[in-house]
């Protein structure tokens, strides 16, 4: 009896050890809507539960809807310009810069900074990567806020991060190309949609309004196919 019990325990230990060393169990996940398990027809969800799910879906999805709607509208501009003389607009893959502080009458940005020159551009990174041009701002504060479709910031590019002047490559989530010589760094977006909002500090003086124009004219983005290693300017 003892021998049988010992054999049984040994076999159990061996089988348990083999299971522990084997690959972890993977559960297949649906990849299409039709593969999802659906509730039975007689199941009725409480109204409070349905409202809670709807609220969560709205909060989760609204940033993306907002981003895509803005991109579809703003990129209709035939060239970099200012809509209503206030809001930067530009074709897909390019950006437009202000040359002064943002005007109080604008409503596109809810809480804008009051001491920077703004810019704005939208991209389709599944079509082609985009070169982001960073001029030498000297001691001036600057930052390029870059966002994906979820409005998550996807890069640390600016004076607070010790970024160097030069060229940076913004690519989509599936891009596998070669990085050209002369590119300081590669920024990968988690979505094909991305946008950039440069901010360049400017003193509220006539002298600095004149001085900031030179670097602002070199704040540009353009498709990788147009990159030649030379700093461009408007």
Functional labels for PLM-detected ranges:
Residues 1-22:
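Gram-negative bacterial Sec-dependent N-terminal signal peptides
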Residues 21-234:
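A compositional/structural signature for long, glycine/proline-rich flexible linkers
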